[in-house]
Amino acid sequence: MAKVPIAFLKFVIVLILFIAMSGMIEACIGNGGRCNENVGPPYCCSGFCLRQPNQGYGVCRNR
C-alpha cells in the first residue's frame, strides 16, 4: 500500500471543510428577505431577523 504524504491529507481535510462551509454560507437569506427566527434554517446572512410583534414573519436586516 502506498504512503500518502501528510501534506496531501491536510490539504484534503481543508478542502472538505471549505466545501462544507461554502454550502452553509449559500443557504442563508439576504437582507430584505422574509425570515422566521422560531423555525430554524435558513437563517439571515446578517444573523439578525427583525420581527414586529403583530407579524408572523420578520425581515432580515443588519443590526
Curated annotation (Swiss-Prot):
Major localization listed first in the record, in broad terms: secreted
Location of the protein in the cell: Secreted
UniProt note on tissues of expression: Seed specific.
Span of the signal peptide: 1-27
GO cellular component: extracellular region
Keywords (A to Z) from UniProt: Antibiotic, Antimicrobial, Disulfide bond, Fungicide, Knottin, Plant defense, Secreted, Signal
InterPro entries membership: Antimicrobial_C6_CS, Gurmarin/antifun_pep, Gurmarin/antimicrobial_peptd
GO-annotated biological processes: defense response to bacterium; defense response to fungus; killing of cells of another organism
Superkingdom of origin organism: Eukaryota
Positions of disulphide bridges: C28-C45, C35-C49, C44-C60
Keyword Signal: yes
Known function: Possesses antifungal activity and is also active on two tested Gram-positive bacteria but is non-toxic for Gram-negative bacteria and cultured human cells.
Subunit: Homodimer.
Family membership: Belongs to the AMP family.
Domain remark text: The presence of a 'disulfide through disulfide knot' structurally defines this protein as a knottin.
Protein name: Antimicrobial peptide 2
Gene: AMP2
